[in-house]
């Protein structure tokens, strides 16, 4: 069994990419479980055709404790037999959502949820912002990490930060970076830019996913593209990505870059203008 995790900036399309890729894997005959590690509990909605799956933390709060839960209450089978679990988290402004990830994964292990699987995938909230959300990396639960990014500066900044988190635990936990997934935003020279970022981070751009409105059409119906329009070229993109992950033998310890190096990269590709210190902080009328 391989345990992988999808990380990336909030709003980059991480959950959508993960669900479509896992759907493609299941279509290939792989036995898959998705563990959502986001308080929004939206990591399984396209597989289950639901708004949000009831989470481990939510059910534990209703029943009194995690020990009072039955596995079939929190683990639901969706399309292609994909097993789905959402860790969930507390109400906004109360408690630590990262604790929900820790509690849920521990419960799933003890309840035997990891038996008879080929792939377990963790869909993790945004950046590596706290120890709880870094838990799949920190405790070696996820052995390989895939970072969803794009040619936008903040998406690349987040990818570099996540690479730092992987590096921190690479020697103690054995976690490795499997590659960057470019979820295209149609920025200039995007594929070249992410390939160069990958090179500097000592990894690969494992796949470039082109922008296609069919993804949004499928999402509105709470479906993956694989199910909604299986003959669409976009469905084949996710199948290619799934196949590349299954056969990926390039798992590396990343080499994060500095913020200055990232800005230089963007300048080299013409995404960001050479900084002119004389105009910083000046309004248009003054500058």
UniProtKB/Swiss-Prot annotation:
UniProt KW Chaperone keyword: no
Keywords associated with the record: 4Fe-4S, ADP-ribosylation, ATP-binding, Iron, Iron-sulfur, Metal-binding, Nitrogen fixation, Nucleotide-binding, Oxidoreductase
PTM per Swiss-Prot/TrEMBL: The reversible ADP-ribosylation of Arg-99 inactivates the nitrogenase reductase and regulates nitrogenase activity.
Cofactor: [4Fe-4S] cluster
Protein role: The key enzymatic reactions in nitrogen fixation are catalyzed by the nitrogenase complex, which has 2 components: the iron protein and the molybdenum-iron protein.
Name this protein carries in UniProt: Nitrogenase iron protein
Record-listed ATP binding positions: 8-15
Residues that hold [4Fe-4S] cluster according to the record: 96, 130
GO molecular function: 4 iron, 4 sulfur cluster binding; ATP binding; metal ion binding; nitrogenase activity
Organism: Frankia alni
Reactions it catalyzes: N2 + 8 reduced [2Fe-2S]-[ferredoxin] + 16 ATP + 16 H2O = H2 + 8 oxidized [2Fe-2S]-[ferredoxin] + 2 NH4(+) + 16 ADP + 16 phosphate + 6 H(+)
Family: Belongs to the NifH/BchL/ChlL family.
